[in-house]
C-alpha cells in the first residue's frame, strides 16, 4: 500500500528548487530549469490532494499508454565516443545514459490505444515530426542498442562493413544498407523480441508509423457502397461461376427468338358458311286474324320444346 505523499508548500518547493544561495538554479541550463520547475509544480499539486497516490502505487506496473505518452527530446543521432588509446578505458553505457538524461527533455506525443480481439493492448504513435526533429531517436532502448553496436565497431575498428555483416550472419542483399537497418535485420534473424511500440524503430530515414486498415473496419462501410455497383459486382461473380452443362439465359432467349422469327405463317382456318334465314316473324295483328279465320299456322322448322 502506497504511503501518504508528503505535502509541499510553495516556500519549501521554491527553496528546494533554487537551492542555498541560488547556486543550484544558476548552474542549470534552460532545459533543466524548465524540467525542475515542472517537477516542483507537480509536487505542489500532488501535496494538496491524494489523487496521485494511487497513480504512484501503480507506477511499478506495466502501462503502455503512459510509456508512449512522453518521448525524449533532441539527442544525437549516433552515440558520441571519446577516441582514447587502447590502454585507456572507454565510456560505458551508464555514463552515456546519464549524459543523454541531461540532453533530453520531455515532449508530448500523439498516441492511439487499440485493443486486439485477444485483449492485447496496442499503442501506436501518430505524432508528426518536423524537420528539426527528424534526426532524433524516439526511444532510449534503441539508442542503447545503437551505442552497443557502435562500441562493437569501435573494438573492431579494422574490420570492414562486409566482415561486420558476415559476423551478424546477414544475407548478401543486406550488406549495402545502413547500420540501423542492419541492426534491425540482425535482431529479426536472431528471433529476439521485437519492440512493443512502433516508434522504437523510428530512425532518421524512416517515416512515422503507418497503421494498416483492418478488414473489419473496411466491412463497416459496406453499406455506403452504391447499390447498382454492388449488383453488377454480384452479377459478375454469378456469371463467372457456372455449373457444367448450364445454358446461358441470354443465349437461350436469342435462340428461341430466332426460331419464332424463322417460322412460316400458320394456315388460315376454314370460315363458317352462313345460310340465310328467310323466316318472317308474324305480327300480332296477322296472328289475331289467322286465329279468327281458323287458319292454322305454318309448321315451324324447329320444335318449340326440346323432346
From Swiss-Prot:
Domain of life per record: Eukaryota
Places the protein is found: Cytoplasm; Cell projection, Cilium; Cytoplasm, Cytoskeleton, Microtubule organizing center, Centrosome, Centriole
Pfam families: HYLS1_C (PF15311)
Tissue expression from the record: Expressed in hippocampus and dentate gyrus of 3-month adult brain.
InterPro entries, per database record: Centriolar_ciliogenesis_assoc (IPR052319), HYLS1 (IPR026227), HYLS1_C_dom (IPR027918)
GO BP, sorted A to Z: cilium assembly
One of the record's GO cellular component terms: cytoplasm
Primary localization class, coarse: cytoplasm
Region feature (Disordered): 47-78
Key words of the record: Cell projection, Cilium biogenesis/degradation, Cytoplasm, Cytoskeleton
Family, per entry: Belongs to the HYLS1 family.
Task performed by this protein: Plays a role in ciliogenesis.
PANTHER family for the chain: CENTRIOLAR AND CILIOGENESIS-ASSOCIATED PROTEIN HYLS1, HYDROLETHALUS SYNDROME PROTEIN 1
Name of the protein described by the UniProt record: Centriolar and ciliogenesis-associated protein HYLS1
Highest classification ranks of the organism: Eukaryota, Metazoa, Chordata, Craniata, Vertebrata
Amino acid at each position: 500500500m502506497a504511503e501518504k505523499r508528503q505535502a509541499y508548500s510553495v516556500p519549501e518547493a521554491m527553496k528546494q528548487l533554487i537551492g542555498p544561495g541560488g547556486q543550484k538554479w544558476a548552474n542549470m541550463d534552460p532545459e533543466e530549469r524548465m524540467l525542475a520547475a515542472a517537477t516542483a509544480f507537480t509536487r505542489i499539486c500532488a501535496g494538496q490532494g491524494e489523487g496521485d497516490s494511487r497513480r504512484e502505487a501503480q507506477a511499478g506496473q506495466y502501462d503502455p499508454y503512459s510509456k508512449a505518452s512522453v518521448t525524449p527530446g533532441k539527442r544525437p543521432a549516433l552515440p558520441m565516443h571519446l577516441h582514447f588509446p587502447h590502454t585507456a578505458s572507454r565510456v560505458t553505457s551508464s555514463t552515456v545514459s546519464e549524459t543523454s538524461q541531461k540532453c533530453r527533455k520531455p515532449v508530448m506525443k500523439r498516441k492511439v490505444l487499440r485493443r486486439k480481439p485477444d485483449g492485447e493492448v496496442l499503442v501506436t504513435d501518430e505524432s508528426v515530426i518536423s524537420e528539426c526533429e527528424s534526426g532524433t531517436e524516439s526511444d532510449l532502448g534503441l539508442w542503447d542498442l545503437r551505442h552497443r553496436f557502435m562500441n562493437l565497431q569501435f573494438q573492431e575498428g579494422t574490420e570492414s562493413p562486409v566482415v561486420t555483416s558476415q559476423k551478424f550472419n546477414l544475407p548478401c542483399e543486406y550488406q549495402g544498407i545502413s547500420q540501423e537497418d542492419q541492426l534491425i535485420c540482425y535482431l529479426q534473424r536472431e528471433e529476439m523480441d521485437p519492440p512493443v511500440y512502433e516508434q522504437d524503430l523510428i530512425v532518421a530515414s524512416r517515416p512515422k508509423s503507418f497503421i494498416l486498415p483492418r478488414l473489419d473496419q473496411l466491412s463497416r462501410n459496406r453499406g455506403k457502397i452504391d447499390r447498382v455497383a454492388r449488383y453488377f459486382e454480384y452479377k459478375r461473380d454469378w456469371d463467372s461461376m457456372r455449373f457444367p452443362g448450364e445454358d446461358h439465359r441470354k443465349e437461350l432467349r436469342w435462340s428461341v427468338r430466332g426460331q419464332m422469327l424463322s417460322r412460316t405463317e400458320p394456315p388460315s382456318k376454314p370460315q363458317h358458311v352462313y345460310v340465310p334465314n328467310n323466316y318472317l316473324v308474324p305480327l300480332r295483328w296477322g296472328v289475331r286474324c289467322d286465329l279468327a279465320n281458323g287458319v292454322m299456322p305454318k309448321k315451324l322448322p324447329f320444335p318449340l320444346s326440346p323432346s
